[in-house]
Amino acid sequence: MRRSIAARISIVVLAFLAAAAPRLSRAVDAAVLHFDSASSPPNNIVIGFVGGFVSHDNSRHGPVQLAERIRQAVPQGTYVRVFENRRRKRAYDAVVRLLDTDRDGVLSPDEKKRAHIILFGHSWGASAAVLLARDLRRLGVPVLLTVQVDSVAKVWQNDSVIPDNVAEAVNFYQTQGLIHGRREITAADPVRTEILGNYLMDYKKDPVQCPDYSWFAHAFTPGHMQSECDPHLWTQIENMVRQRLSPQPTSAAAAQPLNPTAAK
């Protein structure tokens, strides 16, 4: 009951934040690829989800900025795209289409084996990343890494248990304001999934300036807002992603987040 009430409050608050957010002109198409889709499948698939009712190309938001930096820096042959959290089915279809190299509508064991997928998101988008990983599990498709930033689940969702097709998962959260993220994620199978950590971002101690966000966000959801515009946090995530997209990925231990404020 308490969770249901909290979820309803989150919906109302996130809707207000979306209404208060300034509208931007369309950014560069988030579907721009670093490979020729007509010739070969991508070596890497990186998919992000924005939170609330944010547009996938609103460049003032952390996931969109991260995707653009990854596009500009990662190896050729990498597909990078951001989706609205409500477009999970569209993201799923994109992954299946990219993996289905023979275009027969069915993923073969070899096509699944070639999957090199990283998923990340903020708020409702973080929950969407976990749910997409779960969708891919039903197909037998592995996921390298999921990254949750201040993850907020909708009423019918479970963003706390990471499915066993995910190799590594990490969770960042804060506790300030009306909306705050899940404190802890766990692995459905600890043998197959390594939880890199549940990291508290203390914005009372180390505040982040977010001048482009609404007065409502500053007043009522300051921590949630800061988790989305925190350059240090998103740089850590970018480094984690880039390490795993290199030809010879570093070990899980070497790729853990750098000096988090606190670890659970």
Give the role of each language-model region.
Residues F35-A115, A219:
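Active-site catalytic motif of lipid deacylating hydrolases and related acyltransferases
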Residues D164-K264:
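C-terminal catalytic-base region of ester-bond hydrolases, centering on the histidine
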Residues L66, I70, V95-A187:
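Serine-dependent carboxylesterase/thioesterase catalytic core
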Residues S55-P63, R88, Y92, G121-A129, ...:
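Solvent-exposed, acidic/flexible segments
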Residues S10-A19:
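Bacterial N-terminal signal peptides
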